[in-house]
Amino acid sequence: MASYRLSEQAAEDFESIYIFGLLNFGLRQADIYADGMEARIEQIATQPELYPSIEHVRSGYRLSVYRSHSIYYRLDDCGVVIVRILRSQDVGAALE
């Protein structure tokens, strides 16, 4: 398995997404969505260049869209860093 880590903010984003799903759609759907997002993150770690660069948003960042969320990530010496997992927000401010 390829190496990746979640930033503190991305971990908080993931937890918030799960709680929102749990409260609004129930345990089964929250688990299904979280499992799918984890699979996407593992795919990103394995094939980080599969998804487009978003240099116009932030230098060195890439973007993968999973259903209604955007996964922003970058590469460093240790592998993939998942920076944020966002819905519709001001991306520029959220990535600073």
Residue ranges and their predicted role:
Residues 1-32:
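Arg/Lys-rich, positively charged N-terminal/basic patches that mediate binding to nucleic acids
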Residues 44-46:
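Short proline/glycine- and basic residue-enriched helix-capping loop/turn segments at helix->loop/beta transitions
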Residues 51-79:
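Basic/aromatic recognition patch in beta-strand/loop cores that engages polyanionic ligands
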Residues 69-96:
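Enriched for short, Lys/Arg-rich terminal
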